C-alpha cells in the first residue's frame, strides 16, 4: 500500500494524474461530436465506476473478504479493459484518433489506475 502519491509514482507501471487527464481530455474532446463514440465513452465510464467501487475499499478488506471479492474485481477490471479497447478501435476506425491508447498502454494496473482517475474526475464534475 502506498501512503503518498510520491510513493505511487515510483512504481514502474504508475500513471501520473496529469498524464491520465491528458489522455481523458483527448478521448472526451475527440469523441464529443460522435454519438456512437459518446455511447462507448459512457460504457467505459460505467465499467470504470463498477471497478473503482470494488477497488476503493480493497485495502480495508480482510484476507477472507478479498478472497470473496477477487473474482468480481477481476471481472470488472476485464470489463474496463474491454470497454477501453472497444473505444480505441472505434476511434481508430472512424478517424477520431486513438494515439491515447498507445500512450496509456496495455498494462492492467495502469488501465485500472486510469479508470480510478476518470472516476475521480467524474465525481468532481458532479458537484
Task: Report the location of each language-model feature.
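Short, charged, amphipathic alpha-helical segments
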Residues: 41-42, 64-82, 100-105
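Short, charge/polar-rich alpha-helical segments
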Residues: 24-49
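Charged, low-complexity interaction regions
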Residues: 31-37, 57-70, 93-98
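Short intrinsically disordered terminal tails
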Residues: 1-3, 7, 11, 122-127
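Amphipathic alpha-helical binding modules
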Residues: 82-127
Amino acid at each position: 500500500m502506498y501512503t503518498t502519491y510520491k510513493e505511487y509514482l515510483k512504481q514502474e507501471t504508475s500513471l501520473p494524474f496529469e498524464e491520465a487527464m491528458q489522455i481523458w481530455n483527448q478521448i472526451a474532446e475527440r469523441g464529443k461530436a460522435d454519438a456512437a463514440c459518446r455511447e462507448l465513452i459512457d460504457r467505459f465510464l460505467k465499467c470504470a465506476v463498477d471497478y473503482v467501487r470494488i477497488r476503493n475499499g480493497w485495502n480495508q478488506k480482510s484476507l477472507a473478504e478479498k478472497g470473496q471479492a477477487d473474482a468480481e474485481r477481476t471481472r470488472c477490471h476485464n470489463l474496463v479493459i474491454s470497454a477501453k479497447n472497444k473505444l480505441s478501435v472505434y476511434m481508430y476506425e472512424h478517424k477520431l484518433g486513438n494515439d491515447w491508447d498507445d500512450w496509456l498502454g496495455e498494462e492492467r494496473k495502469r488501465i485500472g489506475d486510469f479508470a480510478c482517475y476518470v472516476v475521480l474526475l467524474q465525481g468532481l464534475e458532479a458537484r
